[in-house]
């Protein structure tokens, strides 16, 4: 059997039709997801019940035949495994107990202690490795340290990550220690996902764009480099996708600086610019505006084709610039796939 298309792209091969998957492809836009989510009772129960987490991971594969399935979990399971309280408020999102001092960082569990909490996630990966179609690539993931830290410091998502920036300004050494602890735990977490059957892993740095200058180097580039180097040492041949969202011009050179096999792009950068400045270093992933899966129409088709064409001279995985939204029309996803695959 020939190698899976996404693995070929991640090795630098240019394919006539780009492989495709979507961030948050298992999500509320799908009626079957909503039914399974109701069966679970709450979001965390869905994440920690392997049969149900595997089921929602498989649903978009059955419906659309995406080239990859991404593990259904949440980036905030890791801080919970490090000892923080985690709960979800209906209509508002996640809440965490907070880490705002050197003492708070010191009180976190060591990286080696995360696996008891996260063992259901690894079981989900094992189920998926058995049940996915043979041609479908299984992607594991974690939040990148900066993004995870923003939630651990603020106790919730914030529009400007101000609490994390304040902690960083007040006690840079303590904040760096927090980043180090998350980095160590992320290495062990992704390594365990790979051991359970993940064929690719992705680092989501959703708030990388709020880091500037030296901070971007210290808290986005360097942790990613450490994580990728450690994973490559433990698991040679396992590709890593990095997503420093809203990095803008810093997308250029990110693969070289971190060792990532692929850089995922948000839709704030033009595909033509990224093809010239980012794709020269290897595979790129992206970058359709998810809002087009809500509005649909000819603009969805033409923009999908434009992105495919822009990246056609090098290795490319088609994806969105951010996660698909609950308001997206499932029929528009089918239209997008038709525009890509013909």
UniProtKB/Swiss-Prot annotation:
Keywords: Cytoplasm, Decarboxylase, Lyase, Porphyrin biosynthesis. It catalyses: uroporphyrinogen III + 4 H(+) = coproporphyrinogen III + 4 CO2. It is an enzyme of class 4 (lyase). Catalyzes the decarboxylation of four acetate groups of uroporphyrinogen-III to yield coproporphyrinogen-III. Homodimer. PANTHER family: METHYLTETRAHYDROFOLATE:HOMOCYSTEINE METHYLTRANSFERASE RELATED, UROPORPHYRINOGEN DECARBOXYLASE. This is Uroporphyrinogen decarboxylase. The gene is hemE.
């Amino acid at each position: 059997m020939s190698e899976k298309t996404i693995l070929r792209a991640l090795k630098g091969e240019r394919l006539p039709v780009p492989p495709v998957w979507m961030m948050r492809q298992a999500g509320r836009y799908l009626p079957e997801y909503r039914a399974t989510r109701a069966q679970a009772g709450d979001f965390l129960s869905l994440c920690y019940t392997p049969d149900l987490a595997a089921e929602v991971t498989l649903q978009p594969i059955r419906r659309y035949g995406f080239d990859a399935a991404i593990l259904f979990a949440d980036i905030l399971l890791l801080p919970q495994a490090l000892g923080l309280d985690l709960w979800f408020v209906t209509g508002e999102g996640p809440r965490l107990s907070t880490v705002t001092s050197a003492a708070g960082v010191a009180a976190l569990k060591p990286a080696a202690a995360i696996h008891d909490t996260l063992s259901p996630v690894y079981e989900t990966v094992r189920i998926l490795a058995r049940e996915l179609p043979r041609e479908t690539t299984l992607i594991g993931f974690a939040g990148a340290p900066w993004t995870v830290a923003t939630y651990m410091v603020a106790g919730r998502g914030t529009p400007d990550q101000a609490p994390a920036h304040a902690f960083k300004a007040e006690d840079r050494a303590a904040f760096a220690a927090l980043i180090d602890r998350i980095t160590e735990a992320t290495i062990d977490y992704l390594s365990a996902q790979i051991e359970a059957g993940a064929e690719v892993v992705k680092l989501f740095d959703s708030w990388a764009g709020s880091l500037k200058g030296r901070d971007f180097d210290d808290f986005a580039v360097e942790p990613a480099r450490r994580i990728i180097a450690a994973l490559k040492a433990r698991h040679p041949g396992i590709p890593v996708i990095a997503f420093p969202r809203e990095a803008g011009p810093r997308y250029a050179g990110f693969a070289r600086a971190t060792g990532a096999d692929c850089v995922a792009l948000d839709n704030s950068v033009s595909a033509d610019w990224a093809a010239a400045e980012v794709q020269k270093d290897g595979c790129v992933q992206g970058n359709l505006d998810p809002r087009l899966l809500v509005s649909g129409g000819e603009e969805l088709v033409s923009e999908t084709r434009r992105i495919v064409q822009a990246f056609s001279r090098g290795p490319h995985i088609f994806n969105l610039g951010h996660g698909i939204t609950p308001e997206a029309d499932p029929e528009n996803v089918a239209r997008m796939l038709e525009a890509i695959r013909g």
